[in-house]
Design a protein with these regions (language model features):
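Acidic, serine/threonine- and glycine-rich low-complexity intrinsically disordered segments
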Residues: 153-263
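Surface-exposed amphipathic alpha-helical segments
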Residues: 55-63, 154-192, 296-328
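Post-signal peptide N-terminal segment of secreted/secretory-pathway proteins
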Residues: 26-44, 58-141
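A short acidic-to-branched-hydrophobic micro-motif
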Residues: 61-106, 153-157, 202-238, 266, ...
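Bacterial N-terminal signal peptides
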Residues: 9-16
Length: 328
């Protein structure tokens, strides 16, 4: 396997493509899977937030994380036949991890209260605790729900406990397993969705590993201030300032590109350092202020140089398939 140049990747992604969520990269989530529903032969459809994308079956989803209304949520399929035993084991593991957190000053214990929740799924437990030793006033909640076909974890924090309780209860009571009959209010997770319209604060991050050492990343965030600068503008500015001396950049394709009625900018470039070349594909859309239908979106792909036509076809097909999830 050819080793990618760390310098080249750092320069192109961080400086030109504007980077991706470090927190999302560090998360280790249970592996989700795609579905062939709605996809062409040999393709899989992946749902994320309020959008969907089709990718060749050779692509594997490595990480998918999402937030809705300030709550971090992800669902998963049970591994064991004895669901009750599995959920108790997972819950105890979570509690053990929470108990190892550093205690804020002035607090006597990490966990404030553990409780069963009624009216949410088939079974639900919640733990209230101090999750940040630097800010002792923040109250964290982690909730674990058994919905039958799937389990779900939710974590959020805040200063107003009643507001947090109302928020996560509303989110969890609107969860549905599967992707049939999606609506404009569907916010998709790994295996199901939350049927709530956009209100505020939504984030999605996904990373895929594909053939020919391709890495595809997708990031979506609601924005409160639309930026006029796109990926092409950042590339031009970086080259003008010689921001990465020693890196030769060959522009293969650049310009405006509309994806799923979302206006944006696209670049396909080749970067070379010390005779090692990599290909970088990127598209972004600035979104609209405070919108779930038009979030700020960044899609990027990096891989070793070579097979440009084949990789470009994969890239174009992926962007052409990107669409609102309700239209799948």
């Amino acid at each position: 396997m050819r080793k990618l140049s760390p310098l080249l990747i750092a320069v192109m992604i961080s400086l030109i493509l504007c980077g991706y969520s470090d927190a999302a990269e560090r998360r280790s989530l249970l592996k989700p899977t795609g579905t062939t529903k709605g996809a062409k032969q040999g393709m899989k459809t992946y749902y994320m937030g309020r959008f969907a994308i089709d990718l060749p079956a050779a692509f594997q989803l490595e990480i998918q994380s999402q937030k809705i209304r300030y709550a971090e949520v992800f669902d998963f399929k049970w591994k064991e036949r004895d669901r009750a035993k599995e959920r108790e084991s997972l819950w105890e593991q979570k509690l053990a991890k929470i108990k190892k957190l550093q205690l804020p000053k002035g607090r006597k214990q990490i966990i404030i209260e553990e409780k069963h929740l009624k009216g949410i799924g088939n079974w639900a437990k919640a733990v209230e605790y101090y999750g940040d030793y630097r800010i002792g006033d923040y109250i964290y909640w982690t909730v674990f729900v058994d919905y039958g076909e799937s389990g779900l974890w939710l974590t959020l924090y805040g200063l107003n406990n009643q507001k947090s309780l109302k928020n996560f209860t509303n989110i969890l009571t609107h969860y549905q397993y599967g992707f049939d009959n999606l609506t404009k209010d569907s916010f998709c997770l790994n295996h199901g969705r939350i049927e709530l319209p956009y209100l505020e604060q939504e984030e999605i991050y996904a990373r895929f590993a594909g053939p020919m050492e391709m890495k595809l990343r997708i990031e979506m965030n609601e924005t409160q201030q639309v930026e006029d600068v796109g990926v092409l503008d950042r590339l031009v500015a970086s080259l003008a300032m010689n921001f990465a001396p020693g890196v030769d950049v060959d522009k293969i394709r650049t310009g405006s590109r509309t994806v799923a009625v979302l206006p944006g900018q696209e670049i396909i470039i080749r970067g070379t350092v010390n005779d090692v070349s990599e290909l970088f594909f990127a598209w972004d859309s600035p979104g609209r202020e405070d919108s779930g239908e038009y979030p700020e979106i960044r899609i990027g792909l990096e891989c070793p140089d070579g097979s440009l036509d084949e990789k470009t076809k994969i890239w174009d097909a992926a962007l052409d398939s990107f669409r609102p999830a309700s239209k799948s």
